[in-house]
């Protein structure tokens, strides 16, 4: 089998330890010293030359740091977590809906989704472009438009999409005491990807995407490396 590598567009933000909204910290150890303290390697300590760079790191990671995918377990006690969520809902064909003209707290309606003219099929991954990635790590980072509950129902109940993603930090009004869009998505086993970037670099409305989380049991959300695979003339 031959895998054709097309043009790759990076869709994840670069993360800097200690400078993110959610926890991200790295602690660095000498590998031999660190392994010597574990039961697995305590009897096999190696005195390596001092001029050899050989490190091991401990990572403190918030589950919602950077570009991340939220699983049903985020809102549903019986929902799937990172280790259980099927990858065929995070890898496949995606479509792009451009709502970059929308302002803070302005709703994206069902009719506006239809009026984009983009053909959305059952099993698609839907990306909503807001251009909020341009305000990443600024005081206005959360000044995002929102997806109406009617538009959400249209996507998950009438069409049957697999996943939804956005370059905003969310798709609901920030600070409210409930999250009906999240709950509707998760009830239909639809994961939600937040804080994507470079959606403005996608020239085609349909393309292939790969979004892979860590396979950690009980994890409600997980940072991902998301990429789009596009044809040469679609960049």
Feature-to-residue mapping (PLM):
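Active-/binding-site microenvironments in catalytic and ligand-binding cores
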Residues: 1-235
């Amino acid at each position: 089998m031959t895998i054709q590598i097309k043009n790759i567009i990076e869709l994840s933000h670069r993360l800097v330890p200690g400078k993110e909204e959610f926890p991200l910290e790295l602690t660095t150890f000498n590998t031999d010293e660190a392994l010597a303290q574990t039961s697995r390697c305590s009897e096999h300590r190696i005195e390596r030359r001092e001029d050899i760079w050989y490190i091991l790191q401990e990572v403190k990671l918030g589950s919602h740091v950077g570009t991340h995918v939220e699983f049903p377990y985020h809102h549903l006690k019986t929902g799937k977590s990172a280790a259980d969520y099927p990858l065929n809902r995070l890898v496949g064909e995606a479509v792009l809906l451009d709502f970059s003209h929308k302002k803070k707290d302005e709703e994206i309606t069902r009719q506006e989704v239809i009026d984009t003219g983009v053909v959305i099929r059952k099993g698609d991954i839907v990306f909503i472009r807001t251009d909020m990635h341009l305000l990443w790590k600024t005081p206005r980072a959360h000044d995002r438009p929102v997806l109406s509950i009617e538009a959400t129902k249209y996507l998950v109940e009438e069409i049957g999409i697999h996943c939804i993603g956005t370059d905003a930090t969310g798709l609901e009004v920030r600070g409210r005491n409930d999250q009906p869009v999240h709950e509707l998505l998760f009830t239909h086993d639809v994961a939600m990807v937040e804080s994507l970037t470079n959606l403005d670099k996608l020239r085609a409305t349909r393309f292939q995407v790969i979004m892979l989380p860590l396979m950690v049991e009980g994890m409600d959300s997980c940072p991902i490396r998301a990429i789009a695979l596009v044809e040469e003339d679609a960049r």
